[in-house]
């Protein structure tokens, strides 16, 4: 049974209710401060921009309702998937052996969702304002008989300025997607919410622009009122007693020039720009909801200690790959060898050997025969056969060449167990050249075969041990290589014993050419 879809019906309903929340009411209209032609033109442009914004906001409100309906439609589809899964669970609980039917994808029902709202086209007054050409007395009466402080337009400006933050706050209702659900339908709704939230923030900026255009208008009007002749000027002119008609005409011309300058400055200073808001983003259809839209989180990992893939392999027996572990142990890689070198000579030529090389037989109790001398003359003082027998849990080498490989050398090549002295196996010479082939005359004891007070006399069991354990590796006299160089002493605490090579192939006798031993009654060998 597939994993459960992640959704919470109450959480989705809360988000849907939030998306269809009512937007705070926007600013209302304003009245013209006077009846000048310039004023009427600018006022008409401001009202056209405000009406365009309001119609666009209504389209945004529709999109919020459409997103809310889409969330509810997706929740219904998710619920149908859950019903399918519940029916499947009941079928399994009743013991049915029939194969479970595949869960059908459910397409959210968007049929009841209204379409996007079309924003009506509105004509923006683009013609230039007619020039206010009139007597200064008539202009003064028009200007000063109206709203000289332009209080209505200033209130209009302040409302739109404050509405910017209101719209930004309204857009935050859509910023965060619904919690507790996921899947393709959830991502579609969440993306629609984010786009609409950004759009509302942009509409807030458009409100700020409209407020700035209104500020341009009221500032120009304030200058007009301040610079234009007033009604007191008209009264004073009419009540004045002029000495001559020339004086009267001269005074009138001065007032007319002042009026015209003020009106021209007003017309030039009240030029505003049209506000052109973009239409809101529209959510389309929702993708089908499938069982398994939510990716399952892995609850367990393959393998474990001693299990498949764990890389651990237990067991005993030197060189054996088997054991009591749960899986096949990984074999360590052997160092790459030159075809002209035997496996053992590769090791001795490349690095120092920390201890005697274990035999491939994996003897668990054998050791150096008591009284015998250690094999592999010239080996470090800490080398040789461990006292407790050969070490166990030594992995075998998987890449050993075959017997017919031309790279193999005779069994006598390389430092192995002492042919004439049958102690231990595989204690080769570190960093020493290859020894000559062993003949029948080269395996007899020599005066130099003793080391450290030991007697280099072959024993009855030593030869057999040398043949069994050092097969293919021995072939050098017990004293061969004595004194060829000083070995660095190894600290077993810092450099523990490490299996560098394990012999795992058919081998030849390591004591070729031995003559039958004769024992006397005294127990001495001859």
Swiss-Prot record:
Feature: compositional bias, Low complexity: 335-362, 393-405, 430-440
Alphabetically ordered keywords of this record: Secreted
Location(s) in or outside the cell: Secreted
Coiled-coil regions listed in the entry: none
Gene Ontology cellular component terms for the protein in this record: extracellular region
Gly residues bias spans: 303-328, 363-387, 413-429, 451-484
Ranges annotated as biased composition (Basic and acidic residues): 1-23, 485-508
Region of interest called Disordered, as start-end residue ranges on this chain: 1-35, 91-110, 271-526
Phenotype reported upon loss of the gene: Loss of DNA conjugation when disrupted in recipient strain; strain still secretes EsxB.
Described purpose of this protein according to its UniProt entry: Involved in DNA conjugation, at least in the recipient strain.
Further comment found in the protein's record: DNA conjugation in M.smegmatis is unidirectional with distinct donor and recipient strains; mc(2)155 is a donor strain while MKD8 is a recipient strain. Mutations in a donor strain that alter DNA transfer do not always alter DNA transfer in a recipient strain.
Protein family (similarity comment): Belongs to the EspB family.
The protein, known as: ESX-1 secretion-associated protein EspB
Species whose genome carries this gene: Mycolicibacterium smegmatis (strain MKD8)
């Amino acid at each position: 049974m597939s994993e459960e879809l992640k959704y919470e019906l109450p959480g989705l309903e809360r988000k849907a209710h939030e998306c269809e929340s009512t937007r705070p009411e926007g600013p209302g209209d304003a009245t013209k401060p006077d009846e000048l032609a310039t004023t009427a033109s600018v006022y008409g442009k401001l009202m056209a921009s405000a009406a365009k914004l309001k119609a666009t906001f209504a389209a945004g409100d529709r999109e919020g309702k459409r997103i809310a309906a889409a969330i509810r439609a997706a929740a219904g589809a998710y619920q149908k998937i859950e019903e399918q899964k519940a029916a499947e669970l009941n079928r399994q609980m009743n013991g049915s052996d029939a194969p479970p039917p595949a869960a059908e994808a459910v397409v959210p029902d968007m049929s009841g969702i209204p379409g996007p709202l079309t924003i009506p086209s509105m004509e923006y007054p683009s013609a230039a304002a007619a020039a206010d050409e009139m007597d200064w007395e008539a202009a003064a009466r028009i200007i000063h008989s109206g709203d000289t402080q332009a209080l209505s337009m200033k209130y209009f400006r302040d409302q739109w300025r404050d509405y910017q933050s209101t719209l930004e706050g309204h857009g935050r209702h859509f910023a965060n997607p619904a919690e507790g659900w996921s899947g393709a339908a959830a991502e579609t709704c969440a993306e629609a919410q984010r786009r609409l939230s950004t759009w509302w923030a942009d509409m807030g900026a458009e409100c700020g622009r409209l407020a700035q255009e209104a500020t341009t208008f009221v500032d120009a009007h304030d200058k007009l009122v301040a610079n234009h002749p007033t009604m007191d000027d008209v009264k004073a002119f009419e009540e004045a007693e002029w000495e001559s008609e020339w004086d009267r005409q001269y005074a009138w011309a001065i007032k007319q020039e002042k009026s015209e300058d003020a009106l021209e400055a007003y017309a030039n200073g009240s030029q505003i720009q049209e506000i052109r808001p973009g239409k809101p983003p529209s959510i389309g259809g929702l993708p089908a909801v499938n069982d398994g839209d939510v990716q399952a989180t892995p609850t367990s990992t393959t393998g474990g200690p001693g299990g498949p893939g764990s890389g651990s392999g237990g067991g005993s027996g030197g060189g054996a790959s088997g054991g009591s572990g749960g899986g096949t142990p990984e074999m360590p890689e052997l160092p790459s060898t030159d075809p002209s070198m035997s496996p053992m000579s590769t090791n001795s030529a490349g690095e120092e050997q920390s201890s005697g090389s274990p035999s491939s037989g994996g003897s668990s109790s054998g050791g150096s025969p008591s009284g015998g001398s250690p094999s592999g003359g010239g080996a470090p003082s800490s080398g040789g056969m461990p006292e407790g027998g050969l070490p166990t849990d030594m992995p075998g080498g998987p890449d050993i060449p075959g017997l017919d490989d031309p790279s193999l050398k005779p069994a006598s090549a390389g430092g192995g167990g002492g042919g004439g002295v049958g102690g231990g196996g595989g204690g080769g010479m570190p960093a020493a050249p290859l020894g000559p082939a062993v003949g029948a005359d080269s395996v007899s004891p020599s005066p130099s075969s003793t080391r450290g007070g030991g007697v280099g006399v072959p024993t009855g069991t030593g030869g057999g041990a040398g043949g069994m354990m050092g097969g293919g590796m021995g072939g050098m006299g017990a004293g061969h290589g004595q004194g060829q160089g000083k070995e660095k002493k190894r600290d077993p605490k810092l450099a523990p014993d490490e299996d560098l090579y394990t012999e795992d192939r058919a081998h030849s006798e390591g004591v070729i050419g031995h003559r039958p031993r004769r024992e006397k009654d005294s127990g001495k060998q001859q």
